[in-house]
Amino acid sequence: MNRTAIYARTASPSETALDWQVQALQGLASYLSLNVTHIIRETASGLDFERPGLNKLMCLAKQHEIDTVLMTNLNRIGRDALKVLAVLEELEKHGIKLIIQGGDTVEVADNPLLKYLRRFTPHPSLEVVLASTTE
């Protein structure tokens, strides 16, 4: 059973931006036949990594309440590359698959940026999936 969390964050207090992210990710979840069990909506700066929503996401991962996380962009985690990498490593440690809604193609672990980041992590099995519903 695939238990999926949708994580949406914006720095501005725009409900429209959060609604757009959630709607897009619900569509992606449907397209991928994923069971969305949690939707986390957060309005906070990407520079702050002590956010209630991000903390909730990590708690769900640690407690093995989710298997997959969907987000529209990797920068929804945050704006500090090293801290983002630490979050990715923590998700990987708990066996969580991260699916990022991206461009026009579906790329599974072939992203040059992720290959570069993997050189700095002790977890060579780190997998981030970049996906799109565009065919």
List each model region and its residues.
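Short, structured surface patches at the beginning of a domain
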Residues: 1-135
